[in-house]
Amino acid sequence: LDYHYMDPVLLKASIIHDIFEDVKCVSPDEIISLDQDGKAVYDLVMEVTRRKDESKDEYLRRVLESGSQLAKILKCADRISNLTDLHTDTFDKGFIKKYIDETKKWVLPMAEEVNPNMHYELKDLIRRRESGLHFHRTIWPLTRTD
């Protein structure tokens, strides 16, 4: 919604995009039979779902190189949401660094392709998360000098 996308398939898929990774007892038929967009929603969700035989890099490469426009938009929006919640007080710094590197390598090019505003926001989030890593590494913990 932040980027004014009103495509019903994209919006529905954005709500359930992690369902097959997070919920083991959901069947494709449950998604497909929900409404007239069910098949298209299912197809989009599967397009942004990592396959069991894929490494994370293989998955992100697949979306970047052969994903549909909607899949790339959905992946970028998901990564923006995840980066927004990624802070050193709740996540390990090593995980944050790896996530940022992954975003630069795979998701930034997607955003550049599909939406300049998403690209700008991702670059800004990366900059802020990197500066947070640097800040915590060089300033904290504070030590008393008395």
Roles of regions detected by a PLM:
Residues L1-D146:
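Active-site helical microenvironments for divalent-metal-assisted chemistry
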